[in-house]
Swiss-Prot record:
InterPro entries, sorted: QueC, Rossmann-like_a/b/a_fold
Native organism: Bdellovibrio bacteriovorus (strain ATCC 15356 / DSM 50701 / NCIMB 9529 / HD100)
Domain of life: Bacteria
Residues that bind ATP: 11-21
Family affiliation: Belongs to the QueC family.
GO molecular function annotation: ATP binding; ligase activity, forming carbon-nitrogen bonds; zinc ion binding
Keyword Ligase set for record: yes
Alphabetized Gene3D superfamilies for the sequence: HUPs
UniProt cross-references to CDD domains, sorted A to Z: QueC-like
Name of the molecule in the record: 7-cyano-7-deazaguanine synthase
Pathway recorded for this protein: Purine metabolism; 7-cyano-7-deazaguanine biosynthesis
Record: residues binding Zn(2+): 197, 205, 208, 211
Keywords from the UniProt entry: ATP-binding, Ligase, Metal-binding, Nucleotide-binding, Queuosine biosynthesis, Zinc
Co-factor note (free text): Binds 1 zinc ion per subunit.
Length: 231
């Protein structure tokens, strides 16, 4: 993306979205709005709290969009309390077949597509040129709506559905988690503010797939955040 654009960022307070917000500022973009979605996810309480703190730290406008009807999609363990989120030994982040199986458990129908379209509507209304989500190459292998191809196709769709032809860009879509951590470290991201866990709690659980990927990424980058994990 060219520098000095007005942008809307999607901010879940996870590793990827937080680093993208910091990188957008580094590229001299004006973040006119940071959007966080409450769609009934298990980690909603912590995500909303952490996102607000990150936005405050960056000095950018922040808005929470309520999407209660996502609960109608009752097959995802991220939304349904009586369905177990895969954790611990049930998660093998280096096993592609196993990762595809666990991905099905936490998949929410068209979640990222809906998020991008809502963000694009805000972008057009606020005179912004682009929407910046937080994606990564590691999870794109099992979640196609994290891929660069998805970003490209979303931009093509928005050319027709927004009068100012809002684009979708992401600074981390080509990177794996360890490289995103290194990028964030260079940007001086305050890691204690992020929330990369599938659950709410006092600390990151350390056992869900998102935590296991984050744990490995921080270790690979030689950054000690053990105190932020429950286990």
């Amino acid at each position: 993306m060219k520098k000095n654009k007005k942008v809307v960022v999607l901010l879940s307070a996870g590793l990827d979205s937080t680093v993208n917000a910091y990188e957008a500022i580094k590229h001299h973009h004006e973040i006119v709005l940071a959007l966080t979605f409450n769609y009934g996810q298990r980690a909603a309480k912590k995500e909303l709290e952490a996102s607000a703190n990150i936005a405050k730290h960056l000095g950018i406008p922040h808005k929470v969009v309520e999407l209660p009807w996502f609960k109608d999609f009752n097959k995802s363990s991220l939304l349904v309390e009586d369905q177990a989120v895969p954790t611990g030994s049930a998660v093998e982040i280096d096993n592609q077949q196993k990762s595809e199986e666990t991905a099905k458990s936490v998949w929410v129908p068209n979640r990222n597509g809906i998020f991008l379209n809502i963000a694009a509507a805000y972008a057009e209304a606020l005179g912004a040129d682009a929407v910046i989500p937080g994606f990564n190459a590691e999870e794109a292998a099992t979640f196609p709506d994290n891929s660069r191809e998805f970003l490209e196709q979303a931009t093509k769709s928005l050319w027709y559905s927004t009068s100012n032809h809002v684009t979708v860009g992401c600074y981390t879509a080509h990177l794996k988690k360890p490289d995103i951590v290194r990028l964030g470290q260079g940007l001086k991201v305050p890691w204690e503010l992020i929330w990369p866990c599938y659950f709410s709690g006092d600390k990151w659980c350390g056992q869900c797939e998102s935590c296991l990927r984050s744990k490995r990424a921080f270790a690979s980058a030689n950054i000690d955040v053990k105190h932020l994990f429950k286990e």
